[in-house]
Amino acid sequence: MYTAKIKQSFQLLALIAVVTFSLQPVLAFDNSNGPDLPGDCSSIAVEEGNKLSFHAYARGVQIYKWNALTSMWDFVAPAANLYAEPNFFGEVGSHRAGPVWESKSGSLVEARRVQGTGCTPDPNAIAWILLSKHRTEGSGIFSSVTFIQRVNTTGGLAPTLPGLQHGEIKEIPYTAEYYFYRAENPNSN
């Protein structure tokens, strides 16, 4: 009797899991454990022929500057630390204007946003985006990066209230995950 109840409980849990995951639209692009993307984020999928090489967690700020001429906050730059662990432990590098990601060992990648990409699963956070390598320097974790995905963002949006004076700077906290990819066959890119 007790074994039958345990079996029924596990069957119920399995059914709940199947129903829960089947109701969430997810695009599963197999880039060797890259992120699962919501259905409306297909534009940030990485091209075939690339594989995941590194995954980092970022915590920092998005910097904005008030432009009194346009009455808008202009994006200036990111400033964040990169971590190996989701609890922001094990600092491995930094992220700054360029945009540039630099490892503590000295390798870096500068990238550009791929035009026409991006999605906003959370309207209260900066967009998820796809970037392609512009240049790399040094040897290490970023030396052969071809693409970068920014996903699972929180915060970072421009302020909603106007600035008090032209040139005023605001730093808005944000977190994100960055997935770094390399070509499966480096000689093909």
Regions found by a protein language model. Name each.
Residues Y2-L13:
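Bacterial N-terminal signal peptides that target proteins for export
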Residues A4-K5, F21-S22, S71:
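Short, flexible coil/linker elements and helix-boundary hinge sites characteristic
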